[in-house]
């Protein structure tokens, strides 16, 4: 019998799921449904090389087509493999609901897609600051998750950079450098901040939780990264929350605490113990990027009987699990009648490489790794074959380019209770450093800065035991 698989989500996870279904032997039709109008593309460049592409020469080429969405997409689009040439892509149409018992997806345009098996690959969306002030297009407030987000941010940066040309300064005396504020010092926030700094902007990073990437790196290494970025000219405002935006139609500043004016208090190179102290300040800004994390896109699965606590709860095979209150009919339909798997950022599953606690992993390697496992599971279920339990032990991996630093992370450093600097100097990250992360004496992760690629294999093998 020919079986139809629907994949909800047309990002990297959705694309890899389609490829892996074909590799596993699924010969039936596959339909990929995506909210964005673009074919699958590579997201990491959005905060780095694509964001900066040709903007350094904005004065020389202000009228070029570099900000055209089609041109931007071509630079990051994934090559379509022959194995998925017959896969149907329904793009620009969000999934709005799922009837797992009937095997049917509801789409925003009123159409429906029938399926015998479902892959959930709807990923994440960025969080927004819920504070008063200007909002919407033209407000100077940005997030960065999609290609359209990148194009909007690029256009705003281009306008600011052109305003900062020598000709513009001559026409308007006293014009400051473009002031970019990034709220959030995670990996995306730091990458955007470094990109803006490289374009000649005056950059401040505001982070209530502490030094950059604290949750993953640990305090010592996080402060070392902060010092490195401060030496490059970046300013940090730590331990303080944004409570509003100044400005009417467009942001002119961020309100921090009790409202004191700190326009003259911005001094690059805040103390290593916490950055610039601006409690109660209005921090001037021409443009703001909110990089405060993300949330799983699972609302469309409400009522489907699945456990949607922080993503889609799965077992180690990446089969979606029912919620505790699911009825017997829903449980049967969702778990056995019409098999459902989840991949990528939205999948929460146990990894025996570390422990039996289900977690979501927002790392670059996860869409590919989970797609391989989920496709094998789904194909086996549709064929009535056996699934090997607890055999999925992926090693998380990601990298982050920040100025002259390239960070490589292996394993799950965030699980550690102890961090050791195995080699290198915390005040010379650009010269190379390796930190190892341990939990109860067991190695669970490693982080390297500016390490030669020839060293990556040994770090991976050490974690695999």
Q: What are the residue ranges of the model-derived segments?
A:
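Beta1/beta-strand and adjacent pyrophosphate-binding region of the FAD-binding site
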Residues: 2-11, 174-186
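Mid-to-C-terminal Rossmann-like scaffold of FAD/NAD(P)H-dependent oxidoreductases
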Residues: 348-454
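Flexible, glycine-rich terminal cap/loop adjacent to redox cofactors
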Residues: 8-27, 33-36, 44, 49, ...
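FAD-binding core/adjacent interface of flavoenzyme oxidoreductases
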Residues: 5, 75-179, 257-263, 267-269, ...
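Rossmann-like dinucleotide-binding cores of NAD(P)H-dependent redox enzymes
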Residues: 168-171, 177-179, 187-244, 394-399
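Residue-level detector of alpha-helix initiation sites
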Residues: 11-15, 37, 124-126, 148, ...
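N-terminal Rossmann-like dinucleotide/flavin-binding domain of flavoprotein oxidoreductases
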Residues: 20-112, 218-235
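FAD-site-proximal beta/loop scaffold in flavoenzymes
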Residues: 136-172, 265, 269-270, 274-276, ...
């Amino acid at each position: 019998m020919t079986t139809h698989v629907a994949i909800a989500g047309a990002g990297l996870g959705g694309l890899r799921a389609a490829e892996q279904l074909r590799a596993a032997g699924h010969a039936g039709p596959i339909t990929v449904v995506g909210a964005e109008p673009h074919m699958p593309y590579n997201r990491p460049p959005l905060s780095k090389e694509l964001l900066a592409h040709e903007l350094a020469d904005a004065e020389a080429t202000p009228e070029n087509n570099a900000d055209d969405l089609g041109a931007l997409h071509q630079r990051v689009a994934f090559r379509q493999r022959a194995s998925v040439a017959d896969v149907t892509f329904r793009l620009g149409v969000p999934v709005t609901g799922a009837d797992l018992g009937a095997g049917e997806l509801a789409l925003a345009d009123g159409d429906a897609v029938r399926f015998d098996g479902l892959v959930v690959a709807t990923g994440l969306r960025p969080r927004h600051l819920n504070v008063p002030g200007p909002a919407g297009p033209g407000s100077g407030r940005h997030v960065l998750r999609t290609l359209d987000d990148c194009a909007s941010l690029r256009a705003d940066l281009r306008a600011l950079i052109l305003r900062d040309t020598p000709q513009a300064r001559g026409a308007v005396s006293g014009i400051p450098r473009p002031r970019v504020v990034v709220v959030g010092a995670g990996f995306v926030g730091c990458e955007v901040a470094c990109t803006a700094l490289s374009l000649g902007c005056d950059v401040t990073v505001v982070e209530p939780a502490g030094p950059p990437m604290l949750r993953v790196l640990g305090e010592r290494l996080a402060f070392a990264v902060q010092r490195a970025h401060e030496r490059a000219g970046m300013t940090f405002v730590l331990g303080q929350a944004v409570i509003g935006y100044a400005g009417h139609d467009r942001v002119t500043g961020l309100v921090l605490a009790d409202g004191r004016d700190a326009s003259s208090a911005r001094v690059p190179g805040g103390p290593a113990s916490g950055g610039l102290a601006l409690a109660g300040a209005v921090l001037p800004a021409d443009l703001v990027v909110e990089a405060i994390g993300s949330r799983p896109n699972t609302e469309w699965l409400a009522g489907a009987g699945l456990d949607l606590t922080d993503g889609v709860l799965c077992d180690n095979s990446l089969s979606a699990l029912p919620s505790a209150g699911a009825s017997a009919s829903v449980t049967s339909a969702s778990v056995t009648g019409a098999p459902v798997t989840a991949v990528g950022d939205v999948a929460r599953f146990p990894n025996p490489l570390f422990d039996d606690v289900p977690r979501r992993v927002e790392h670059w390697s996860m869409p590919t790794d989970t797609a391989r496992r989920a496709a094998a599971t789904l194909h086996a279920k549709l064929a009535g074959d056996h699934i090997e339990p607890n055999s999925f032990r992926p090693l998380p991996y990601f990298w982050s380019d920040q100025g002259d630093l390239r960070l490589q992370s292996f394993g799950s450093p965030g699980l550690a209770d102890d961090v050791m600097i195995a080699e290198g100097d915390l005040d010379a990250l650009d010269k190379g450093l390796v930190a190892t992360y341990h939990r109860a004496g067991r190695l669970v992760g490693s982080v390297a800065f500016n390490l030669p690629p020839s060293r990556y294999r040994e770090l991976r093998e050490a974690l695999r035991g």
